[in-house]
Curated annotation (Swiss-Prot):
Subunit structure comment from the entry: Homohexamer.
Names of the cofactor(s): Mg(2+)
Entry keywords, A to Z: ATP-binding, Coenzyme A biosynthesis, Cytoplasm, Magnesium, Nucleotide-binding, Nucleotidyltransferase, Transferase
EC annotation from Swiss-Prot or TrEMBL: 2.7.7.3
Protein name: Phosphopantetheine adenylyltransferase
Residue pairs linked by disulfide bridges in the UniProt entry: none
Primary residence: cytoplasm
SUPFAM superfamilies: Nucleotidylyl transferase
Gene: coaD
Reactions this protein catalyses: (R)-4'-phosphopantetheine + ATP + H(+) = 3'-dephospho-CoA + diphosphate
Similarity section: Belongs to the bacterial CoaD family.
Positions annotated to bind ATP: 10-11, 18, 94-96, 104, 129-135
Organism: Bradyrhizobium sp. (strain ORS 278)
Gene Ontology MF terms: ATP binding; pantetheine-phosphate adenylyltransferase activity
């Protein structure tokens, strides 16, 4: 049986924190699906297509190097439903700190009730990327700050262009 894992998020933009989670997750599964959430009530900085392209460009080579199949797709329903539809048995969630853990434990409990066959796997962020959040990265970029420490090289120019 193929171990399929779903890693959901907005990825607006892809950050080094996301990359850190993917680097760990590809060793836990045979196929990793990065699921880009589409929330109709929110206006992301990057379009859905741009976020999917970033995911493929940044995460695809990492998965390939680890011998893990990779795909990126979108979803606009419950994350647990997206995981079921993808055939996932694992849901990957990154943790930066205790606040994340408290929130993620609630989600994991609700998801387990709705889909007992899907196990949530918490991946702790490596120390250098723990403070990174996509919202802080967007704020820094909007104010002309240096973002290259927080996002993969291929994301720097597109992110700066959004605020040019």
């Amino acid at each position: 049986m193929q171990r399929i894992a779903l890693y959901p998020g907005s990825f607006d933009p892809v950050t080094n924190g996301h990359l850190d989670v993917v680097r760990q997750a590809v060793h836990l599964c045979d196929k990793l699906i990065v699921a880009v959430g589409v929330h109709h009530g929110k206006k992301p900085l990057f379009s859905t297509e741009e976020r999917l392209a970033m995911a493929h460009e940044v995460f695809g080579p990492v998965a390939s190097a680890a011998g893990c199949a990779f795909d990126a797709s979108t979803y606009d329903n419950l994350t647990v439903t997206a995981a079921q539809q993808a055939g996932a048995i694992l849901m990957i969630r990154g943790l930066r700190d205790g606040t994340d853990l408290d929130y993620e434990m609630q989600l994991a409990g609700m998801n387990q009730t709705m889909a007992p066959s899907i196990q949530t796997v918490f991946v702790p962020a490596s120390v250098p990327v723990r403070p990174i959040t996509a919202s802080l990265v967007r704020q820094i970029a909007a104010m002309g700050g240096e973002i290259s420490h927080f996002v993969p090289p291929s994301v720097v120019a597109p992110l700066k262009a959004k605020f040019a």
